[in-house]
């Protein structure tokens, strides 16, 4: 995960100061890419400890099509609480767009079910794409999608994934995003009887919040450790039937947690 540390260095050295919606302010660079070979291990940042439970449950929540934080809270995950309304609702965010995009004809489109079946039917397709950026519903979302689209690519029996992100909280958010899309790629690869290939991140406004700068500098003093491995204990009937206990991260030996405030 040295490439992640190099991105932190890039922002600290080359970032421009920008004001932002949260009022905190950022150091920002534009247009960056990271690549991870999933054959080399599961890309969990090791220079600080990540809350794996939150990463797994959030992805399962997305795949359920759920947009209320109740399921997350019941499973000890609070990462979406700051944006939810008094009833726990977040509007038509990721889960709604992934599982029930509203078409012009009034019908809903399950993009996840479609892309899994299309990978099986037509792995050479250049349309293996899922989007969460529904312009017609952005104003109804408590937080418009930061990671707004992802695309799959099949070659030599391996499934690769590239996701696009308009806004990147590099210290707190990006390590979660990397692990989440790695997990999704492993799950879909298993469902399609493929091995895993590359994971590619493409970011637009890639930033460090000004109240994360010292934490980033501390992280840069730490040496990366070997990547863990992901074990999926069973193959469920569909992409929607995975459970938390199906996943085991083996050999994760991170440096201690580095706390930082969330910019809301």
From Swiss-Prot:
GO terms for MF: thymidylate synthase activity
GO biological process, one term: dTTP biosynthetic process
Record keyword DNA-binding present: no
Single GO cellular component term: cytosol
Enzymatic class: transferase
Key words of the record: Cytoplasm, Methyltransferase, Nucleotide biosynthesis, Transferase
Active site: 146 (nucleophile)
InterPro entries cross-referenced by the UniProt entry: Thymidate_synth/dCMP_Mease (IPR045097), Thymidate_synth/dCMP_Mease_dom (IPR023451), Thymidate_synth/dCMP_Mease_sf (IPR036926), Thymidylate_synthase (IPR000398), Thymidylate_synthase_AS (IPR020940)
SUPFAM superfamilies found in the cross-reference section: Thymidylate synthase/dCMP hydroxymethylase
Function: Catalyzes the reductive methylation of 2'-deoxyuridine-5'-monophosphate (dUMP) to 2'-deoxythymidine-5'-monophosphate (dTMP) while utilizing 5,10-methylenetetrahydrofolate (mTHF) as the methyl donor and reductant in the reaction, yielding dihydrofolate (DHF) as a by-product. This enzymatic reaction provides an intracellular de novo source of dTMP, an essential precursor for DNA biosynthesis.
Quaternary structure annotation from Swiss-Prot or TrEMBL: Homodimer.
Family the entry assigns: Belongs to the thymidylate synthase family. Bacterial-type ThyA subfamily.
Protein name: Thymidylate synthase
The species this protein was found in: Geobacillus kaustophilus (strain HTA426)
Gene transcribed to yield this protein: thyA
């Amino acid at each position: 995960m040295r490439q992640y540390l190099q991105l932190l260095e890039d922002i600290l050295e080359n970032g421009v100061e920008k004001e932002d919606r949260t009022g905190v302010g950022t150091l920002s660079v534009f247009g960056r890419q990271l690549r991870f070979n999933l054959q080399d291990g599961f890309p969990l940042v090791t220079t600080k400890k990540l809350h794996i439970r939150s990463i797994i449950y959030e992805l399962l929540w997305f795949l359920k099509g759920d947009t209320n934080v109740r399921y997350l809270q019941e499973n000890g995950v609070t990462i979406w609480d700051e944006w939810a309304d008094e009833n726990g609702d977040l509007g038509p965010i990721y889960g709604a767009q992934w599982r029930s995009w509203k078409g012009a004809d009034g019908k809903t489109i399950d993009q996840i079910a479609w892309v899994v079946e299309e990978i099986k039917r037509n792995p050479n397709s250049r349309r293996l794409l899922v989007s969460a950026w529904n312009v017609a519903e952005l104003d109804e979302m408590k937080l418009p999608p930061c990671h707004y689209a992802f695309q799959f690519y099949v070659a030599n029996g391996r499934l690769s994934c590239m996701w696009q992100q308009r806004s990147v909280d590099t210290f707190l958010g990006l390590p979660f995003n990397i692990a989440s899309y790695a997990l999704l790629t492993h799950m879909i690869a298993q469902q399609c009887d493929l091995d895993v290939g590359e994971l590619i991140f493409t970011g637009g406004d890639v930033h460090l919040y000004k109240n994360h700068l010292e934490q980033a500098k501390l992280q840069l003093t730490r040496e990366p450790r070997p990547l863990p491995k992901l074990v999926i204990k069973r193959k469920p009937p569909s992409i929607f039937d995975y459970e938390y206990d199906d996943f085991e991260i083996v050999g994760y030996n991170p440096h201690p947690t580095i706390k930082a405030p969330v910019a809301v």
